[in-house]
Swiss-Prot record:
The keyword Cytoplasm applies. PROSITE patterns: USP_3 (PS50235). The gene is PAN2. It comes from Cryptococcus neoformans var. neoformans serotype D (strain JEC21 / ATCC MYA-565) (Filobasidiella neoformans). HAMAP family: PAN2 (MF_03182). This is PAN2-PAN3 deadenylation complex catalytic subunit PAN2. Contains a pseudo-UCH domain. This ubiquitin C-terminal hydrolase (UCH)-like or ubiquitin specific protease (USP)-like domain is predicted to be catalytically inactive because it lacks the active site catalytic triad characteristic of thiol proteases, with residues at the equivalent structural positions that are incompatible with catalysis, and it cannot bind ubiquitin. It functions as a structural scaffold for intra- and intermolecular interactions in the complex. Belongs to the peptidase C19 family. PAN2 subfamily.
Length: 1183
């Protein structure tokens, strides 16, 4: 295998190094790129073996050249370059750094000792990198950009290389060792180190299971280059036959694709290509064209390219491919060579080409806005704040009133200025000039529409906004009120917690957020929630043993319970949306909202009506569990079950509330055969006459939609002829209750002609001069009463309504619901739900349809005697407590040693006030969407979609205090885009029933356990619980939450302390060193809570002093535990009171000051909790 010269390229000089030399070369196995690290600290990417065009050029971290956030720490050569499929890692003696392939920096880690020489990725953790040199080995976290552990090493390290599950370490002393990450990178117990070279080791290379080393030997007490290349099998470091190289090896490269080939070079450029399988006869000798010495060498992934650098600053590229007369050429006669990485992998990414400036034909009629805006970094004059010019006296927004005629008649002009006396009839207080009411408000409203919604961070110290803008505004005729417009959640730098939902909702009724998939269902869910019989069935359904994983009725029951408990706080239907999205039938019916664009003009009115029809039918099916359902009305039944359930002889519970009993009679015109069948309608679709009749009322159209005649052609079941069939649909007389307590109606307004029935009409006979189509009450007469001519019938009143809002045909459409809230005194108030905007409205406004911007979609009617017809007392009110005593898992391969919890005993049943510690871990189902502005700032459009992956709940009291009784991993069938292993500890396969070794349960099972603990009145202890509960999609009353994030804070400070910092400072424990563990986090949150309770029971002043000391120390350490703390913890077993002093003198003094002010807690008990946490002293919160 001969290599032929292809390129000779000198490295460009720099200001700090006029003659840089190549010190590290890497031929990219993933892309057609040669990475060159130079003695100047510059890293360059050269693309294509034919051109070596420069693609990327940046300084490595640790060199003196700054930029991109990299510090200047002295001139340092690039010692190693490693490439992954996404990133580029560089190493100098001063530190390591990671960048994207395009050169953008991602992380840096500095070494103050400036002793680094080599690095290797951790084969068991993709976020960790181990480096070494003359000092200790450092384990760096590439996600956080910090050293997480320091590992003592007896000898300087020359080379680190990743193996299958271990790391190879070649020491300067000549010893080769295999390090095991599972034991803290100590020497592997089953593989003994070997002494490869007696005089020291120069380097090593690894490919597959083969290790090649070269170095020095001793002869008569003097070091000489060892002529033997040592080979070892890495599986046991078993020596293989060595290879002789008399010139003294300086670089040895194992062929990546052929394990029998080795490329060896001496310092002077003597090159040998050795085939170990064929022996010395197959060895190829070549002399590299260098006049000095070889400084670096690299081999491509296929072995067909060889790159090396020399001491004169030249970069050489040789190849085994033909480059002479026999070389392959293209149609233009140019030589064709394969890429550096072969024909696999990805193409190098080049920067976007700058678009040429457009040519403008400049004429007198050319508008000035054809000239684009330049990039700017300060406010433009056009951003002049409105409050500076749109004041109450501004002539721009407050045009002057017309001057009265008496003033004009007596006015005299002097130098273009008019003067006139004020007549007596225009004098008095009522003629004093005043500001036009609402003018300044209109200006602010216009500005607010451009600037976005409210954030809590915009409030002043008094908790109010600087201006007094309200959602209400003055309107012109035909203008859509502001509170009807589509609302969106915006994200500030503080996240979703900074968004002020209270600005949009000042009622006791909770709204629903919009940033979830299929959020168009929010309006109907609100309408169904305030339909009390349906709410009662849904909340009772969660109390039975429903085994369907994605049960919409269960999720609706959980959502309705959350809306009940929240009492005005914002909620989200994320779990309902997740179950809905997992339903294949909904996909087939086209019920999914595929329009993720916020400017979509989708017809949501039609979509919500189809969803209403399908959802109620699904509810009806799901309300029957194991053949049993609730009997709320008197129906014949044979056998009664337990807890209000009975055998399914009659209709389902949903049918009893919403089902319309219909009888359809078909008569064949050909043979006269009559057939009939009974069915149940859950939704009535309104059918309008072809010609508009202004005399028709809503009751007439509803009656004609229930009882109607039609003609169709079909095959007669009697005569088998394809003949016309006369079909008549009517209320079933055989059913005792043809009309249900609740009637769901789809408006079916599909065009402007149909909307003509609904549009308000002027009528002087009405009080306000407007006749509305939708009445407050509707009367429907049943079949028997119709035949007898009686006027009485079933009376319904409107309970709720869903309408579509669309300001214009090309505007964004969305849905709004109106709900009539009953009260104990008999009065009722109407509430509008525009997602998370909730406000009261008048009944006339609800029933009014002034124009096509407001179109009805779903109307829910409730019988005025519904409470008398339904016996809701048979419904269960409490969840089954047995779920806390069952050990449920759907994992096929659960391992006993992975079970870390012990389920509750019956005598441990929690009660009101019982302390439990909780923590949860999550995975990402969808990455966040954001936009980057030209000034470098970013705006989050949609946050990442997180899903519960693990939840752990620990006992907070009793003999087994601190022991988990829930440790459930959550089965996730959706595609996971990021397991967030570093932060969650969740790995691929942990959430799969076929592969998970843990306790794996469906989301609904874990949710039921948490829901039961909330209902029992438990007090939840944890750190950052608001985010956890939000993602779990459960509302816990504030009086049942003890969040250490809120406990350990200073009044008026925005800083939230991390659990790791608090545990390090107060409990003297270093946690979360490798990844997060929910049991560990919950345990330490419980310890911190108990510590706070201990301080609070003694003196509030003592706790305030401790908090001041914590923040003072945190400012010195950037609120991060020193990395040295982890090293000290690993060296010795410490109790909370034996924490050693830190190396820094100031930190030692600060620690001593804090200790002097703190009451030192006693040593830990056998359960790991301090004795003060085990005492039966009453909690200060329970007092």
């Amino acid at each position: 295998m001969n290599y032929n010269p292809l390129h000779l390229l000198p490295l460009p000089p720099t200001a700090l190094d006029p003659k840089p030399i190549p010190t590290s070369l890497t031929l990219d196995p993933f892309s057609d790129v040669l990475w060159v690290g130079a003695s100047s600290g510059i890293v360059s990417a050269l693309c294509s073996p034919l051109t070596l065009a420069r693609n990327v050029h940046f300084p490595a971290h640790g060199c003196k050249i700054g930029g991109g956030g990299f510090s200047a720490q002295g001139v340092s050569a690039v010692r190693e370059v490693r490439v992954t499929d996404r990133d580029v890692w560089t190493l100098t003696e001063g530190g390591i750094g990671g960048r994207k392939r395009g050169g953008a920096p991602k992380w840096i880690v500095s070494d103050v000792t400036r002793s680094l020489r080599t690095m290797s990725p951790n084969p068991t953790n993709s976020h960790e990198l181990i480096t070494g040199g003359s000092g200790s080995l450092l384990l760096a976290n590439t996600a956080r950009g910090e050293v997480v552990r320091s590992i003592e090493n007896s000898s300087p390290v020359v080379k680190l290389a990743p193996l299958h599950r271990t790391v190879l370490a070649a020491g300067l002393s000549g010893q080769v060792t295999v390090l095991d990450p599972r034991t803290g990178f100590k020497a592997a117990q089953n593989i003994s180190p070997v002494q490869a070279h007696t005089g020291g080791l120069s380097g090593a290379d690894v490919q597959g299971n083969i290790v090649a080393t070269w170095g020095w030997t001793h002869m008569q007490g003097h070091p000489l280059p060892d002529p033997l290349i040592r080979l070892y099998d890495v599986r046991a470091l078993r020596p293989l036959p060595p290879i002789s190289f008399s010139s003294g090896p300086a670089f040895v490269l194992l062929h990546p694709s052929s394990s029998s080939h080795i490329v060896v070079s001496s310092q002077q450029g003597m090159l040998q290509t050795i085939d170990m399988s064929l022996g010395p006869s197959a060895t190829v000798f070549q002399q590299l064209d260098v006049s000095s010495y070889i400084t670096s060498m690299a081999l491509s992934s296929r072995g067909d390219y060889l790159a090396f650098g020399d001491g004169d600053g030249q970069l050489h590229v040789w190849t085994t491919n033909e480059t002479g007369e026999n070389a392959a050429v293209d149609e233009n006669g140019s030589i064709v060579l394969p890429p550096f990485n072969g024909y696999d992998g990805v193409k190098p990414e080049w920067p976007d080409q700058v678009d040429p400036l457009p040519t403008i034909a400049w004429e007198e009629s050319t508008p000035l806005n054809l000239v684009g805006m330049p990039y700017y970094n300060e406010a433009l004059l056009s951003q002049f704040p409105s409050e500076c010019y749109a004041t109450s006296t501004s002539p721009l927004f407050n045009p002057p009133a017309t001057i009265p005629q008496p003033v004009l008649s007596s006015m005299k002009m002097v130098d273009f200025v008019g003067y006139a006396p004020n007549p007596k009839e225009l004098r008095g207080k009522r003629y004093v000039l005043r500001a036009v009411p609402g003018a300044e408000g209109r200006a602010r409203g216009k500005g607010r529409r451009d600037s976005g919604p409210r954030f809590r961070s915009e409030k002043d110290k008094k908790g109010t906004y600087k201006d007094k803008e309200e959602i209400e505004e003055e309107l012109n005729d035909g203008e859509v009120p502001k509170y009807y417009r589509k609302v969106e959640i915006k994200y500030s730098k503080f996240g979703i917690e900074d968004f002020d939902f209270e600005f949009y909702n000042r009622t006791n009724y909770s709204g629903l957020e919009t940033d979830i998939l299929n959020s168009y269902t929010n309006s109907l869910l609100q309408a169904l929630h305030y339909t009390l019989p349906l709410r009662a069935i849904a909340t009772a359904h969660i109390c039975v043993d429903c085994k369907k994983e994605h049960c919409l009725l269960c999720e609706a029951g959980f959502l309705f319970r959350m809306l009940e408990d929240a009492k005005g706080r914002n909620c989200q239907a994320s779990n309902f949306s997740r179950a809905f999205s997992a339903t294949s039938q909904a996909y087939a019916l086209g019920l999914m909202d595929e329009n993720t664009n916020s400017k979509s003009t989708a017809p949501y009115g039609s979509l919500i009506q189809n969803f209403n029809r399908w959802l109620l039918s699904t509810f009806s099916t799901e309300s029957i569990v194991d053949g049993e359902t609730f009997h709320l009305r008197p129906f014949p039944q044979k056998t009664s079950g337990l807890d209000g359930l009975s055998m399914n002889d009659g209709p389902s519970a949903i049918d009893q509330v919403l089902g319309v009993k219909i009888k359809t009679t078909n008569t064949c015109r050909h043979c006269g055969f009559v057939s009939s069948r009974d069915s149940t309608l859950h939704v009535v679709d309104l059918v309008y006459p072809k010609k508009m009749n202004p005399r028709l009322s809503f009751s007439d159209i509803l009656r004609s939609s229930l009882i109607r005649d039609s003609t169709t052609k079909a095959i007669c079941s009697s005569c088998k002829a394809f003949a016309p069939l006369d079909s008549r649909r009517s209320l079933s007389p055989s059913s005792g209750h043809p009309l249900p307590p609740v009637l769901s109606v789809n408006a079916m307004v599909t065009n402007s002609d149909v909307y003509g029935f609904w549009k308000d009409k002027k009528d002087v006979k009405e009080k306000d001069g407007v006749r509305r189509f939708l009445p407050k009450r509707v009367t429907i007469r049943e079949v028997g009463k119709l035949e007898n001519g009686q006027e009485e019938g079933v009376k319904y009143s409107i309970r709720s309504m869903v309408v579509q809002i669309q300001e214009s045909p090309d505007a964004v459409a969305h849905l709004v619901s109106f709900v009539k809230m009953p009260s104990k005194d008999g009065s009722s108030a109407w509430i509008m739900f525009n997602d998370f905007l909730v406000r009261p409205v008048s009944e006339d406004e609800v029933l009014s349809f002034p124009d096509q911007w407001k179109v009805p979609a779903v109307i829910i009617l409730e019988r005025e005697n519904a409470e008398e017809l339904l016996n809701l007392e048979v419904l269960p009110k409490e969840l089954d407590r047995e779920i806390l005593f069952k050990d449920v898992s759907i994992a096929w391969n659960r391992k006993q040693d992975m079970i870390k919890h012990k389920i509750l005993q019956r005598e441990e049943m929690p009660k009101r006030g019982t302390l439990v510690a909780i923590d949860a871990e999550f995975v990402a189902l969808q990455q966040e969407e954001m936009e980057f502005r030209s000034d470098g700032t970013k705006n989050i459009l949609r946050p990442s979609h997180m899903s519960l992956a693990r939840v752990s709940v620990l006992r907070g009291e009793g003999e087994m205090e601190g022991k988990p009784f829930i440790d459930d991993y959550i089965h996730t069938s959706e595609a996971v885009v990021d397991y967030l292993t570093e932060f969650s500890g969740i790995k691929a396969g942990d959430l799969d029933p076929n592969n998970s070794p843990h306790t794996l349960v469906p989301l609904k099972v874990a949710y039921k356990k948490l829901r039961l603990l909330v209902d029992l009145g438990c007090i939840f202890v944890g750190h950052g619980l608001s985010k956890d509960f939000r993602t779990i999609n459960i509302f816990v009353p504030p009086e049942q939450v003890m969040d250490t994030v809120l406990i350990y804070t200073l009044p008026g400070s925005q800083r939230k302390l991390s659990l790791r910092f608090l545990a390090w400072y107060l409990l003297h424990q270093d946690i979360q060193t490798n990844s997060h563990d929910s049991i560990e986090d919950a345990h330490f949150a419980l310890l911190l809570c108990k510590l706070w309770m201990d301080y609070a029971s003694e003196s509030e002043e003592a706790f305030e002093i401790v908090m001041e000391d914590i923040f003072a120390e945190g400012k010195k350490l950037a609120f991060k535990p020193p990395s040295s703390a982890g090293n000290m913890m690993a060296e010795q077993q410490l109790s909370p009171v034996s924490f050693p002093p830190l190396s820094n003198g100031d930190q030692t003094v600060a620690r001593a000051v804090v200790k002097s002010r703190m009451a030192t807690p006693p040593p830990p008990t056998k359960l790991g909790l301090p004795q003060w946490a085990s005492q039966n002293s009453p909690s200060p919160l329970r007092r």
